[in-house]
């Protein structure tokens, strides 16, 4: 058990100046979109996964236990199902490698949106609020929550690529 008493934050209204939404959205788009466009599956893992996705989408192997050349899939099925489903739905409109990446780009965008909203809701709670100043000037609840959510989103973007090649 932690015996140290909590040390609440002292945050001024000036410290939580609003980050322009357009700038934040452009930054998120610059993070998500390059992983979708202008590249082919050239790494070994990309080629292998794409091969299974394409075989599933074309009906050359069963969805429940996909194989290529008699070799069973050694990784999780869900990502391959998502890619195969996207290929089946989108391949008449776009090429198969791009179609296979679309659900993963959407999932990454969803993670970014949900992280921002979760941090925003958490920072709006009474327990998360900074201490009020004796003569005013403390951060407004919504402005403080927005600044914390922006920081959480930027921290996620900064560290996600370090954990795994996400795009």
Whereabouts are the PLM-identified features?
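Membrane-integral, polyisoprenol-dependent glycosyltransferases
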Residues: 2-167
């Amino acid at each position: 058990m932690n015996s140290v008493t909590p040390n609440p934050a002292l945050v001024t209204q000036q410290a939580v100046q609003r980050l322009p939404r357009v700038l934040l959205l452009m930054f998120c788009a610059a993070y998500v979109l390059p992983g979708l466009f202008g590249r082919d599956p050239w790494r070994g893992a990309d080629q292998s996964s794409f091969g299974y996705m394409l075989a599933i989408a074309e009906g050359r192997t069963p969805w429940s236990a996909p194989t290529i050349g008699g070799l069973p899939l050694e990784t999780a099925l869900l990502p391959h199902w998502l890619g195969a489903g996207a290929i089946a739905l989108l391949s008449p409109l776009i090429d198969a490698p791009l179609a296979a990446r679309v659900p993963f780009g959407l999932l990454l965008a969803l993670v970014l949106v949900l992280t921002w909203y979760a941090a925003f809701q958490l920072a709006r709670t009474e327990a998360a609020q900074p201490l009020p100043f004796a003569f005013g000037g403390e951060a407004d609840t919504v402005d403080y929550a927005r600044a914390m959510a922006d920081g959480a989103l930027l921290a996620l973007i900064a560290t996600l690529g370090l954990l795994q090649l996400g795009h």
